[in-house]
Amino acid sequence: MFAGPGGLGEGFSTCVDDHDRPRFHSVVSIERDEFSHRTLFLRHFLRSFPSGEIPDDYYDYLNGRITADEMFRRHRPQFNDALKSAVKISLGPETHDEVRRLVRNRLAGRKKWALVGGPPCQAYSLVGRSRMMNHPDFAHDERHFLYREYLKIIIDHRPPVFVMENVKGLLSAQVEGEPVIRRIVTDLAKPKAAMEKRANGLGYRLYSLSEDEQPDEHVDPRLFLVKAEEFGVPQARHRMFIVGIRDDIDVKPGRLRRHKPPTVKETIGHLPAVRSGLSRGKDNPEAWRREILALTAGSLREQLNGAHYAKAILGRIRLHVSDDTFPLERFAMRYPGRPAKRHRALTAMHDSRLSTLHGHEARSHMASDLRRYMFAAVFAEVMERSPKLSDFPESLLPDHRNVDRGRSGEMFSDRFRVQLPHQVSTTITSHISKDGHYFIHYDPIQCRSLTVREAARLQTFPDNYKFEGPRTSQYHQVGNAVPPYLASQIADIIADVLDSMSDGG
């Protein structure tokens, strides 16, 4: 449920046993957003083929040789399978009966299955929450309680196991003085009591995926927090995962096993270098390089005077702008070889049949931002940290009303954030669709924010995973998704639970 572009589903579908046989089959995924659903549908279409037998037509589609419609026409049985399993519906009271029939028909009496998904409690995201909390309609906005639709699905179908994913902001959110997470935990443990005000009935034991101590209705909800970077994902992504096991099933889930993630450079460093575009005026390699060279022509030396890092940064900037290896193109189509780092997350991304690297096109930026990006990347290269606004010379400061407050550390002092090469990235969020200031590439000569493909790699999506729709939507899809590599590890735990059940369910 609430499938988005399919990160959770991808992880569950790629979870295999010791004989490389899939442990899960996705019988239905539901999503309401047009472009996310198109991405989801395409992936379900591919999964309708036997494992390892993606048709050549898919790669021709990625290469632009045929259209999606032509590909679907050539493979009608798989297209029809995807029509049944990837469904575009907006969950709510008006579609409840339709969803109930759909899920019942697709389950077809199966006893061993899992319900996965993250009801979109957008109001509790840490981003923008302070603005929403004081809104007079906040407590009564139906969007914030879409998880109740999730509860209705649990009541209707009594899944043996569910996995609910949501944002870290749930830990601190309150509505009318009540902690939201406490209410959600209570409701998930006794969904029928929550919806029908009954004292007993359907119940679930709730478990953490990352901690040995077992949560209950009164325990610290932070036990449900999963830090993706602790489990091999090259990104500091902290999300809530609550596993529910039906009361009549006497099985406890295992735990995720901590292991080291690859770094940003190990994950995206071997992708071809591309330059950003100029959003105003003529955009060509010469004009772009001219704007970069302007960084050394101003009063940068005087403005950095006194800073202990001034000489090193100025020297490094001159070195980079005199380099003849500036990338000339805004996009790269050539698919690179395997990354040098051997890591399960990186190996899972690679597809030797690819010849085209999809989604590796840099967005356009204002000329002033290009110079800010180069300064920020050089600063990070020298100082091994991303600069704060107080580190920027005045000539590079944005014309923004909050700059002074940012320089003093009051708010958004890290408005320009470099993704450091030898660490994991910061959280890839849907905000990347609006601007790239928080997602600056560490290579100074590229002067740009991350491409869709780089963001997707940091989210551990396979390189053959195509995101449909305009680029803004692609960024949004990537930022909102669950990393498939993490989802696959969760799927292993859930599969073990289901395998331990008696055949009677």
Tell what function each PLM region has.
Residues 27, 112, 223, 237-241, ...:
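Extracellular structured ligand-interaction cores
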Residues 106, 126-399:
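Class I S-adenosyl-L-methionine
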Residues 354-469, 473-475:
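Polybasic, glycine- and aromatic-enriched phosphate-binding surface used to engage nucleic acids
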